[in-house]
């Protein structure tokens, strides 16, 4: 585990910010497999900056994020710590080893958050193109509803399948393609993840754990640019997005 010194007391604008949004810790889930990339996706450079560094920089610059806890594989801890130093990620307080499953990793991160945290924002380390606006809107809604996450509408026709054949259509107006950060009250998501583990569930996102408890998650507007970099094609698309942003 790598531990960083906490930054100096928040300036006035930070104290003013906390009057309208609660203390929020971002947990960056920076583990997982990179088999589809042939190399570690987190350290692939997009326009000269590693994917994980770009992700951290967005949360570092957000005025609604107070702390960053990074959960990663043991062999990546030192490398990520070096990147935090290189890119001045001063909000990063801890880098911890993740678990065998995503739920275990998120729980490991929750165990390290500040006692002041009233919200926890769980974000995929491989989503470097999330924007400050998405983070802020989702934090504010989670502060009111206890759970919130960004989504985008499903555009393709979706079918159920059985034995290799179509078995009926699914109304895409009732579907949402979920993104991160997914933001919750710490006690809510911790209880939900522990219950999901006890129930033997295998989940691909954290909202599913909360839904398993019978609770609802408020949906905020995501972005088609908030992609998860998992394939070589994603790298090309991400670089195109960065180029377009630089030309605006």
Language model: regions and residue ranges:
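Acidic helix N-cap motif at the loop->helix transition within catalytic regions
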Residues: 78-83
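Residue-level signal for inorganic ion chemistry
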Residues: 28, 52, 109, 123-124, ...
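Short aromatic/basic micro-patch
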Residues: 45, 129, 169, 183, ...
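Conserved beta-loop-beta/alpha segment of the NTase-like Rossmann-fold superfamily
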Residues: 101-165, 179
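Conserved donor nucleotide-binding strand/loop of the catalytic core
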Residues: 88-100
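N-terminal glycine-rich phosphate-binding loop and ensuing alpha1 helix
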Residues: 17-77
């Amino acid at each position: 585990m790598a531990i960083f010194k906490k930054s100096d007391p928040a300036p006035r604008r930070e104290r003013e910010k906390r009057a309208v949004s609660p203390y929020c810790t971002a947990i960056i889930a920076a583990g997982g497999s990179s088999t589809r990339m042939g190399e570690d996706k987190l350290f692939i450079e997009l326009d000269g900056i590693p994917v994980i560094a770009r992700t951290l920089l967005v949360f570092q610059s957000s005025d609604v994020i107070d702390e960053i806890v990074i959960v990663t594989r043991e062999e990546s801890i030192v490398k990520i710590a070096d990147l935090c130093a290189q890119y001045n990620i001063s909000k990063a307080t801890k880098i911890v080893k993740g678990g065998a499953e995503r739920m275990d990793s998120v729980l490991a991160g929750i165990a390290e958050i500040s006692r002041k945290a009233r919200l926890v924002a769980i974000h995929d380390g491989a989503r470097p193109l999330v924007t400050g606006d998405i983070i802020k809107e989702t934090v504010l809604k989670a502060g009111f509803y206890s759970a919130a996450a960004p989504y985008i509408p499903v555009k393709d026709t979706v079918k159920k399948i059985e034995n290799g054949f179509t078995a009926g259509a699914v109304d895409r107006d009732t579907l949402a393609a979920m993104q991160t950060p997914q933001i919750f009250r710490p006690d809510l998501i911790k209880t939900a993840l522990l219950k999901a583990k006890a129930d033997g569930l295998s989940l691909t996102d954290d909202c599913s754990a909360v839904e398993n408890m019978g609770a609802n998650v408020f949906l905020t507007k995501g972005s088609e640019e908030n992609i998860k970099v998992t394939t070589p094609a994603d790298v090309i698309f991400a670089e195109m997005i960065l180029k377009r942003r630089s030309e605006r």
